[in-house]
């Protein structure tokens, strides 16, 4: 597993995840609507994930089930979708 990075924030991480979604979708040659439908999502929801935002200024935070559905629709592994070195979650500083 990647090592959490205390200097990184969740907004940056969510945007990188969105970039990975976009790249995988483009590599597959599919539209946002088609991937959204295949993953059981509304097109607007998928668009927000690619932007890395759930609402302006708030990072996207898809459920684990949604991430697996997207990976299945894109024919990729979860490790291909998630950026390395996630930020620390609140409350985990110093925890092992």
Briefly describe each language-model feature range.
Residues 29-55:
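Short alpha-helical DNA-recognition segment
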Residues 29, 53-72:
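Short, basic-rich loop-to-helix N-cap that marks the start of a DNA-contacting helix
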Residues 22-23, 33, 68:
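Residues within the helices of the helix-turn-helix
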Residues 25, 36, 71:
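The alpha-helix within a helix-turn-helix
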Residues 2-7, 72, 79-96:
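Short, charged recognition helix plus adjacent turn
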């Amino acid at each position: 597993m990647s090592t959490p990075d205390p200097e990184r924030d969740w907004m940056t991480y969510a945007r990188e995840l969105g970039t990975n979604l976009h790249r995988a979708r483009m590599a597959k040659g599919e539209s946002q609507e088609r991937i959204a439908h295949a993953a059981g999502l509304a097109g607007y929801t998928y668009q927000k994930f690619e932007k890395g935002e759930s609402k302006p200024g708030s990072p996207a935070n898809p459920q684990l089930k949604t991430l697996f559905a997207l990976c299945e629709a894109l024919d990729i592994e979860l490790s291909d979708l998630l950026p390395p070195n996630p930020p620390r979650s609140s409350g985990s500083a110093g925890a092992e």
